[in-house]
Amino acid sequence: MAKLRSATSTQGRNMAGARALWRATGVKDSDFGKPIVAIANSFTQFVPGHVHLKDMGSLVAGAIEEAGGIAKEFNTIAVDDGIAMGHGGMLYSLPSRELIADSVEYMVNAHCADALVCISNCDKITPGMLMAALRLNIPVVFVSGGPMEAGKTKLSDKLIKLDLVDAMVAAADDRVSDEDSEKIERSACPTCGSCSGMFTANSMNCLTEALGLSLPGNGSLLATHSDRRELFLEAGRRVMALANRYYRDDDESALPRNIASFKAFENAMALDIAMGGSSNTVLHLLAAAQEAKVDFTMADIDRLSRQVPHLCKVAPSTPKYHMEDVHRAGGVMGILGELDRAGLLHTDVSHVAGENLKAVLVQYDLVQTQDEAVQQFYAAGPAGIPTTKAFSQSCRWPSLDVDRQEGCIRTREFAFSQEGGLAVLSGNIAADGCIVKTAGVDEANHTFVGHARVYESQDDAVAGILGGEVVAGDVVVIRYEGPKGGPGMQEMLYPTSYLKSKGLGTSCALITDGRFSGGTSGLSIGHVSPEAAAGGTIALVETGDRIEIDIPARSITLAVSDEVLETRRQAMQARGKQAWKPVNRERSVSLALKAYAMLATSADKGAVRDVSKLED
């Protein structure tokens, strides 16, 4: 029998002081010896995806205590990438992932918790908690706050569906009237929850289902729907079942590293490719794999991207479908079911919702389930009423979307495309690879040749786009925005949105060592590695250089000879301490961000810390 970690602080005469303090938190004599389950909540009033989470910890705690455990809740920070977008606040977004991971580790280890429930939702919170859970390797269940309902409004007497990106594009488009822009803004984010498309937050919450660490519906069931209450209660029950399996029965298969195995990471990446998920998921899966001690790399992602078809197309890649539509079609389990039937899924992997993924699919794959309760579960739909309250409505779709030929989720035969929604490109400008969300790229732009227009920062690029410097045929190059060079690897949603608003969304490309919001579409290539600040070739590009992009061939090439590049590299090195740094960029960087930059690796490593610098 594995010893409870909490026994360190609850057992023995020498722990009298610790027990006295535990009693002061409400622990009774009869509780000592029970598993202590930490609840990492990320409630904050700053973020719509988290504003409704305040009472969720109490729901989970009640279920834990009914199942025989002690529940103790704490909070983490949560940055809203949308609110932080377009100014210096975005420098803090990716670094907050490491801070969240560390804070969960600190709390769990400092108090010797035996198990963990992670209540997350938005962009960096789920990845940070995932990294911590795999680092700690104690029984864990994830439960997110759920997606926002899609916005809806009437323009020219036509009802349209909206999300955050639509508001940003409309605001920058001179052809949109002030009245229509305001209508779109007021309708884009109608409820609490993570933004309604297949952006980073929803992508990551879906991926926890595929990794085996969250319950079916976690990524797709609306935040406002009353059915979601049961997910929180069941998370508390499940984590206690996992804790008992490990501590009482010596069953190590209950530990997250044995659930999130290499096969599970392949499943998660296959899901991401099939649903056209955010390119940020690549960054976060690579980081999580390192915490799990799983050798999952960009090479594996490249291999999968060539095998997995695009089975589910969701905003921002199409205005037709949002997360509420994915749920109606069977959610993550519906997509995984189609991957299974295509022979592209490992179903023998463990899962917190059942004996293994195969058993979970039998019950929750909408195509094969005979369970009427599950069918009712996927009928949970939007109410269309603005609210910040969780569980505030119980509306049901009048019918389910089981059309696998023309519906939201397709079979392999009727896939949106036979190659998936993400691709890894490489070439002399990105020797260690870069990422493009092909789900959002027009097929006509799968090959593109243009001339570089180079900017040393996102701010300069935005000014150039809005000021008319960028013209059709340009390849906008934004560098020194990587994990180290930014620092913090800013998202480039404003530059891509402004290209759209200027009518350049399909006639220009954008490449960067920064990253993109899950809301980005168009020929937007990010995560260029090595980044400029790490000596990457992207630092040597000059305005006017020819750049060739070939997605089918998975290549991206700076059409400059090796001899010329070597001359430029030597000139860069001659700058001494100013080498591999932006020229004339004015940016205030705090000590906290400088500390982050000192250890940050490039995107192909997940932008995790370079641990070699910490070794003796």
From Swiss-Prot:
GO molecular-function term, one example from the UniProt record: magnesium ion binding
Enzyme class: lyase
Leader peptide range in chain numbering: none
Gene Ontology cellular-component terms listed: cytosol
UniProt keyword Lyase present: yes
Catalytic residues as annotated in Swiss-Prot or TrEMBL: 517
Known catalytic reactions: (2R)-2,3-dihydroxy-3-methylbutanoate = 3-methyl-2-oxobutanoate + H2O; (2R,3R)-2,3-dihydroxy-3-methylpentanoate = (S)-3-methyl-2-oxopentanoate + H2O
Biological processes per GO annotation: isoleucine biosynthetic process; L-valine biosynthetic process
Enzyme Commission code(s) on record: 4.2.1.9
Membrane spanning residue stretches: none
Coiled coil: none
Binding of Mg(2+), residues: 81, 123-124, 491
Cofactors (names): [2Fe-2S] cluster; Mg(2+)
Pathway named in the protein's UniProt entry: Amino-acid biosynthesis; L-isoleucine biosynthesis; L-isoleucine from 2-oxobutanoate: step 3/4; Amino-acid biosynthesis; L-valine biosynthesis; L-valine from pyruvate: step 3/4
Cofactor info, note text: Binds 1 [2Fe-2S] cluster per subunit. This cluster acts as a Lewis acid cofactor.
Entry keyword set: 2Fe-2S, Amino-acid biosynthesis, Branched-chain amino acid biosynthesis, Iron, Iron-sulfur, Lyase, Magnesium, Metal-binding
N6-carboxylysine sites (modified residues): 124
Binding of [2Fe-2S] cluster, residues: 122, 195
Listed PANTHER family: D-XYLONATE DEHYDRATASE (PTHR43661), D-XYLONATE DEHYDRATASE YAGF-RELATED (PTHR43661:SF3)
Subunit composition and interactions: Homodimer.
HAMAP family documented for this protein: IlvD
NCBIfam families: ilvD, PRK12448.1
Protein name: Dihydroxy-acid dehydratase
Source species: Shewanella loihica (strain ATCC BAA-1088 / PV-4)
